[in-house]
Amino acid sequence: NSAGAAAPGTGPVAAGGDGDDSLYPIAVLIDELRNEDVQLRLNSIKKLSTIALALGVERTRTELLPFLTDTIYDEDEVLLALAEQLGNFTGLVGGPDFAHCLLPPLESLATVEETVVRDKAVESLRQISQEHTPVALEAHFVPLVKRLASGDWFTSRTSACGLFSVCYPRASNAVKAEIRQHFRSLCSDDTPMVRRAAASKLGEFAKVLELDSVKSEIVPLFTNLASDEQDSVRLLAVEACVSIAQLLSQDDLEALVMPTLRQAAEDKSWRVRYMVADKFSELQRAVGPKITLNDLIPAFQNLLKDCEAEVRAAAAHKVKELCENLPIEGRETIIMNQILPCIKELVSDTNQHVKSALASVIMGLSTILGKENTIEHLLPLFLAQLKDECPEVRLNIISNLDCVNEVIGIRQLSQSLLPAIVELAEDAKWRVRLAIIEYMPLLAGQLGVEFFDEKLNSLCMAWLVDHVYAIREAATNNLMKLVQKFGTEWAQNTIVPKVLVMANDPNYLHRMTTLFCINVLSEACGQEITTKQMLPIVLKMAGDQVANVRFNVAKSLQKIGPILDTDALQEEVKPVLQKLGQDEDMDVKYFAQEAISVLALA
């Protein structure tokens, strides 16, 4: 599989004559590096450190690495494993003094066609760069970066972009100037892929440069990349803007960066505007309060009104964070006058993703705006969203109720909440039903026991007989959480009787649900209720004509057994399990015998 270096010889490794085969596997691993079967080569590469340990540092350097360097035309999977292994190889070639021996194979890997392999090779090179001394870095690592940066293939030039920032800080001034020059030329490379790679590393590179170089070199590069003909390059420049903005003073920001950022927020490509919206909170923190008020707020208003739904949704997601990060003084006025009018429009947006994004954060504004504003301005919006035709919107409002509960109490909403909860609870999509069930214990806690018993209890019982198993299962767990919230006395009076009635249901699935409920309720309700109210029902169901029910009786007895006292176990449970242990159905027998042994009733 290789036309280059010979594989490391196996002779000296497997020394020790016929009797000693302890080193034999190494010989096999080395042979497998050349095997026709990809899987065997892959296994061998994954055990590369074992081979290197056996060969010792010198032979790893002189035989194994040249062999690996020459075999780099293999399946991508094998190359990926190799690139990963070599990143942790410094100790196996003799430590930092010899780290440069690992560069040739990784340099080859950094130029292959498959992106995943190149990225892994770059990651390993970045790791190894830290282990070079400054002298070795300039002698071995920097030349590698320069070779990649001026390579004929775009693959090598894209890989170079990820290596500048790790070798720059420790290089001499003359070499630093060369590194900056190479980075500059890659930012204006003819191939869009290379410019993309350079743009994606611009922020990272800016962080390791001297401030003067940031102003004189990075900012012009940022400006050019932000007006590149390819929108995929421009949107990466927006990401870099966050890092660059953190490095500059307010005056420099205003003069050097803001014109470009303003332009990006109005870019003709929606993907660039989307990126501005998506990075809005980071940009806001990076540019500070003054520029936020003068520049970012107007830009944000436009993004919330953007003609592209994706952009509006991304901006809507950021509403709460934007408001939280505004300086407290004057915050309320800005939100009420500049942000809230846009939000009101979004509540009735034509796109459900936009409405859903807004619904997931809008409740958080109540803590920022306080009680009176919430009641007067936000409450009508919440109520409108609770009536929205899209279930996701209603669900997002309901699942964020806790924010509002802290500010105005949930009573204000309870009359409108109820129809919304009922509709979601009966939604045709079972995942929507599932989501509302999972939120029920929190809702119950916020609305209180009277409201719950009057309005929501029947829903919780209805879910127990849903036609989707996942819903029945979630509804069962929901009961347990409710008992933990409202206490055992409530359970005994309200829940347990309703659950036990289902034991006589003609549908065997519903009879089984009774057992599942007892499994989770017994622990929450304790010994007395379990023994007096639940156990008799379980024992009676042992005579059910459906085998599925009978074996679930055995499982239930195993589950509630530890809660019961010894008398009940010996006198009531044991005879029933023994009878089930003789059942004609194999499964019933199996689970009954398992229960007998787990409960030590044999």
From Swiss-Prot:
The keyword Repeat applies. Pfam families: HEAT (PF02985), HEAT_2 (PF13646), PPP2R1A-like_HEAT (PF22646). GO terms for biological process: meiotic sister chromatid cohesion, centromeric; spindle assembly. One of its GO terms (molecular function) is protein phosphatase regulator activity. GO terms for cellular component: cytoplasm; cytosol; nucleus; protein phosphatase type 2A complex. InterPro entries: ARM-like, ARM-type_fold, HEAT, HEAT_type_2, PP2A/SF3B1-like_HEAT, PP2A_Regulatory_Subunit_A. The keyword Nucleotide-binding does not apply. It comes from the Eukaryota. Keywords: Repeat. HEAT repeats lie at residues 21-59, 60-97, 98-136, 137-174, 175-213, 214-252, 253-291, 292-334, 335-373, 374-412, 413-451, 452-490, 491-529, 530-568, 569-602. Belongs to the phosphatase 2A regulatory subunit A family. PP2A exists in several trimeric forms, all of which consist of a core composed of a catalytic subunit associated with a 65 kDa regulatory subunit (PR65) (subunit A). The core complex associates with a third, variable subunit (subunit B), which confers distinct properties to the holoenzyme. Interacts with IPO9. Interacts with SGO1. Interacts with RAF1. The PR65 subunit of protein phosphatase 2A serves as a scaffolding molecule to coordinate the assembly of the catalytic subunit and a variable regulatory B subunit. Each HEAT repeat appears to consist of two alpha helices joined by a hydrophilic region, the intrarepeat loop. The repeat units may be arranged laterally to form a rod-like structure. This is Serine/threonine-protein phosphatase 2A 65 kDa regulatory subunit A beta isoform.
